[in-house]
């Protein structure tokens, strides 16, 4: 089998909220989609403690995309991992995470997301969308910062 083609984006910022506030905001997918414009309609979120699954539609450059199912694992409250369980063509998988580390200035948040394609479709999507993902993930983290700091208690 050929090696997959992976396209990633990463963003980081400091948010003046607790790690718990940050990660619980991400897990409230209906709210988080205000920061992550790649999330379309949320079909469901099932959570059992620190694990669960979410199914949501996608959006690429504002255009609707088929739904994906992601499993998640929360390591309270330092890390949140997402893994693709059922992905629409041409995706073969997805891996993403958020890490949170407390600092004197606030919570240092790092978000990385990687879309996994086949070799040929990946090359095409890198040309078409790779630039956008590299810009969108850092912008997503900044949108999250603005939303969370505006709603601070």
Q: Which sequence ranges carry the predicted segments?
A:
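Hydrophobic residues on conserved beta-strands that form the core of alpha/beta folds
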Residues: 10, 109-110
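Hydrophobic-ligand binding "helix-grip"
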Residues: 4, 33-37, 43-44, 48, ...
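Residues that form or flank phosphate/diphosphate-binding pockets in enzymes
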Residues: 17, 91-92, 119-120
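A conserved amphipathic terminal alpha-helix motif
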Residues: 116-153
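Residue-level detection of beta-strand scaffold positions
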Residues: 14-16, 82-84, 111-113, 134, ...
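Hydrophobic ligand-binding cavity/cleft-lining segments
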Residues: 1-50
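Short, charged, surface-exposed hinge/linker loops at domain edges
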Residues: 53-54
């Amino acid at each position: 089998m050929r090696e997959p083609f992976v396209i990633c984006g990463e963003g980081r910022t400091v948010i003046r909220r607790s790690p718990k506030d940050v990660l619980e905001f991400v897990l409230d997918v209906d709210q988080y989609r205000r920061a992550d414009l790649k999330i379309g309609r949320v079909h469901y979120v099932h959570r059992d403690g620190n694990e669960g699954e979410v199914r949501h539609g996608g959006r690429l450059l504002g255009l609707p995309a088929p739904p994906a199912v992601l499993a998640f694992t929360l390591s309270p409250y330092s890390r949140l991992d997402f893994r693709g369980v059922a992905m629409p063509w041409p995706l073969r998988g997805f891996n993403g995470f958020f890490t949170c580390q407390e600092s004197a200035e606030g919570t240092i948040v790092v978000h990385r997301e990687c879309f996994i394609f086949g070799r040929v479709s990946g090359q095409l999507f890198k040309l078409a969308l790779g630039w956008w993902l590299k810009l969108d993930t850092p912008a997503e983290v900044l949108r999250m910062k603005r939303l969370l700091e505006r709603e601070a208690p």
